[in-house]
């Protein structure tokens, strides 16, 4: 929620929002004002008290995060029913493997540090001599 401007503030002022939630969010805002940057948001959800069955969260752009960057919280009632849901679900987009993305980034950037230091300084030149690379 946007605590200061826009829909977050209007929602907090709405009579539909329980008074306890307003107090909780105001306390969180006061406690974290100096900790969070202007774009950071924190929302505490008591899933049991609010009757929430499934909650999704993700880094940066909410549901536009890459695979592996999301968190799904499920109540016990829903958690044990996943098998019925998974049989009828298919991903609408090509699934990405975050591990492969990180590995690809590492492979493309692995020599940047060593080349910046100079070939002679990396491992004392021993690694390069062992593979037949001329080292002075």
Swiss-Prot record:
Gene3D superfamilies: Type I PLP-dependent aspartate aminotransferase-like (Major domain) (3.40.640.10)
Keyword Hydrolase on entry: no
Tissue: Expressed in leaves but not in root tissue or seedlings.
Gene Ontology, cellular component aspect: peroxisome
EC number(s) from the headed UniProt entry: 2.6.1.45, 2.6.1.44
Keywords attached to this entry: Aminotransferase, Peroxisome, Pyridoxal phosphate, Transferase
Cofactor(s) for this UniProt protein: pyridoxal 5'-phosphate
Root EC class: transferase
Main location: other
Description of how the protein assembles with itself and partners: Homodimer.
The protein's name: Serine--glyoxylate aminotransferase
Organism (species): Zea mays (Maize)
